[in-house]
Amino acid sequence: MFARLPLYLRLVRMDKPIGSLLLLWPTLNALWIASDGHPTWPLLVIFTVGTVLMRSAGCAINDYADRDFDRYVKRTENRPITSGKIKAWEAVALAAALSLLAFLLILPLNTLTKELSVAALFVAGSYPFTKRFFAIPQAYLGIAFGFGIPMAFAAIQGHVPLLAWVMLLANVFWSVAYDTEYAMVDRDDDIKIGIRTSALTFGRFDVAAIMICYAATLGIYVGIGVLLGFGVLYWLGWAAAAGCAIYHYTLIRNRERMACFAAFRHNNWLGGALFVGIAAHYAAGSF
């Protein structure tokens, strides 16, 4: 069992934390806004650890679902299931165990949060299969990656206000932007194997679509900032995030594979900038 631990860690991408961070930033935004800048330490631990666990479970399910496709994609041909180092049933069992651990974490929270977690599990588990049917599965991914937002509001406020759903919508636009950059890396392979992605759906308008999605994300956060009366520290964070989006354009405009992948990874800084702006605003108001 312990000898196989490195394989399991590779399966759930513990060596690639970018995915967990892309889930974590929107969740932290929600925790700070829902609590007026004062989330409790237990909630921070529950949602942070839960985010890592569910992202890991999602990776295991994704590799299970894509096991017959990954062998034809250069970037994924050596993944543990595809290479035969881990059996398919092991990935399913690991995903189930991680999901159970994540659910156990939220047992102290209210009923609404638990109910939302069931919906979150369904969306996360079904996402990998949407690549067979949906023209833009990245939008579905945005819902999966953003479910921590309504759950955070439910845990703190006991209900899910309209603001939470607006923040989730912003996350959908952001996910379409960064995961289209990711899909541009595999475009040629995806055409061969018949996987549907936003990069293929947008075609020659892929770069324009990405920038429109960034603009929509940032535009929604302008509305949030105005609605909540955020101060200059928030807007500095917002400006840094906008600068990241502009930088991404310089990376993706020529559609070079590694540059597109670099843009995808750089979204950690965009998400982090928005969170720092939100947290700084509330912190400044505490003094």
UniProtKB/Swiss-Prot annotation:
<dbReference type="InterPro" id="IPR039653">
    <property type="entry name" value="Prenyltransferase"/>
</dbReference>
<keyword id="KW-1133">Transmembrane helix</keyword>
<feature type="transmembrane region" description="Helical">
    <location>
        <begin position="89"/>
        <end position="109"/>
    </location>
</feature>
<dbReference type="GO" id="GO:0008412">
    <property type="term" value="F:4-hydroxybenzoate polyprenyltransferase activity"/>
</dbReference>
<comment type="pathway">
    <text>Cofactor biosynthesis; ubiquinone biosynthesis.</text>
</comment>
<dbReference type="GO" id="GO:0005886">
    <property type="term" value="C:plasma membrane"/>
</dbReference>
<dbReference type="Pfam" id="PF01040">
    <property type="entry name" value="UbiA"/>
</dbReference>
<comment type="similarity">
    <text>Belongs to the UbiA prenyltransferase family.</text>
</comment>
<feature type="transmembrane region" description="Helical">
    <location>
        <begin position="199"/>
        <end position="221"/>
    </location>
</feature>
<keyword id="KW-0472">Membrane</keyword>
<dbReference type="InterPro" id="IPR006370">
    <property type="entry name" value="HB_polyprenyltransferase-like"/>
</dbReference>
<keyword id="KW-1003">Cell membrane</keyword>
<feature type="transmembrane region" description="Helical">
    <location>
        <begin position="267"/>
        <end position="287"/>
    </location>
</feature>
<feature type="transmembrane region" description="Helical">
    <location>
        <begin position="158"/>
        <end position="178"/>
    </location>
</feature>
<feature type="transmembrane region" description="Helical">
    <location>
        <begin position="30"/>
        <end position="50"/>
    </location>
</feature>
<dbReference type="InterPro" id="IPR030470">
    <property type="entry name" value="UbiA_prenylTrfase_CS"/>
</dbReference>
<keyword id="KW-0460">Magnesium</keyword>
<keyword id="KW-0808">Transferase</keyword>
<keyword id="KW-0831">Ubiquinone biosynthesis</keyword>
<dbReference type="GO" id="GO:0006744">
    <property type="term" value="P:ubiquinone biosynthetic process"/>
</dbReference>
<protein>
    <recommendedName>
        <fullName>4-hydroxybenzoate octaprenyltransferase</fullName>
        <ecNumber>2.5.1.39</ecNumber>
    </recommendedName>
</protein>
<keyword id="KW-0812">Transmembrane</keyword>
<dbReference type="InterPro" id="IPR044878">
    <property type="entry name" value="UbiA_sf"/>
</dbReference>
<keyword id="KW-0997">Cell inner membrane</keyword>
<feature type="transmembrane region" description="Helical">
    <location>
        <begin position="133"/>
        <end position="153"/>
    </location>
</feature>
<comment type="function">
    <text>Catalyzes the prenylation of para-hydroxybenzoate (PHB) with an all-trans polyprenyl group. Mediates the second step in the final reaction sequence of ubiquinone-8 (UQ-8) biosynthesis, which is the condensation of the polyisoprenoid side chain with PHB, generating the first membrane-bound Q intermediate 3-octaprenyl-4-hydroxybenzoate.</text>
</comment>
<dbReference type="InterPro" id="IPR000537">
    <property type="entry name" value="UbiA_prenyltransferase"/>
</dbReference>
